[in-house]
Amino acid sequence: FRYADFDGDSRIASYFNWLDPNVVKSLLSNELRAELPSINPLEHSLSEIADEIPPLNKMLYLEQKHYLADHNLNYTDKMSMAMGIEVRVPLLDPDLVELSARLPIKFKQNNREGKWIFKKAMEGILPNDVIYRPKTGFGVPMRNWIQGPLKKLVREILSETSINNRKWFDHKAVSQLIAQDQAGKIDGSYSIFQLLCIELWARIFIDEDII
């Protein structure tokens, strides 16, 4: 309900916020905070397309341009190539993507049933209990990791000295986030994990430190 009073493109863009933008902003150093753009990058992407496009198609546009490209395809490619496996994505054939983009809304979502035309096309080919079973995510036990086996690493990598030397984040805000998460007051596990990954990335590719 945090974004319930947002209008138009602001509301559509808010559905794709992995983390609360205000929380992200609070974690940044004063120098980086001052350089933040005044407009949400997702809203900027929506400004590139026509206003009369239906909200569902706007959401699919953001899904394809940002979430799919930067998240799903990215980690699928990295993980598969790390194992020496070539993963193909036939549903991203350019002709099929263009055809799907032109389809009327009623073929994409029928009442609360998403991927409607795709599911109808598979009837008679796959069992209906496979086609229409509820979607299941592939989440990881992030909170258990952060509060368990990664707890010591988090304290070492995101120490006050480390944060101050990097000058990207506010060490007081980061320390408070970690403390509140460990105390069970909030679930800050994904924020902490992203901070951890950023610092490790910086050590490897900027500092050229062999970890």
Regions found by a protein language model. Name each.
Residues 2-211:
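Adenosyl-5′-phosphate
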